[in-house]
Amino acid sequence: FESFQDISKLSKDLVIENLIESGVWTSFRTRPFSKIPKINDEPEEIFISLISSDPLSLDPEFYLKKHIDDFNFGLEVISYIPKNCVHISTSSNFDLSKITSDKINYHEFDGLHPVGLVGTQIHRISPVSMNKTVWTINYQDVVMIGKLFKSGSLDTSRTVALCGPQVSEPCLMETEIGASISEIS
């Protein structure tokens, strides 16, 4: 795949073409209905949650400490897609670098689960309807997009939290998209 060190050389069509060719397009989900978007669809906005309120989940801020440059590059790349902007939800004590852009808006949420669910955040920021579609994407997918556009290579690694009552040695584990949890646990 082609690499783009200079983000200003990108266009919406070039971003979409590269996401489709690499297979990363399938990382996006529509709201309502949580479907992979059609290639010619255009969302009003894209939402990314950096809040982990569900029990036993990986803390996005912990993960992003190692990947913040790729995440921010990926944010700039996907900001070419929506009609309006990309919304990032964080906790009020989020302490990593943020991008200053007219196309990227940050929102703070605190509280118990389900505050970390992107659907809850969409409802509070910009509710969807039958006539208004937005997309969502996972923060690790944004990192993958950043790496793809920076380096031209597809990195399908994932960090997962292996924990719970059936796990004798809880840990964070590096794996690949599609790995069988029963085989690695």
Model-predicted regions and their roles:
Residues F1-E183:
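Buried, small/hydrophobic-residue-enriched core segments of structured protein domains
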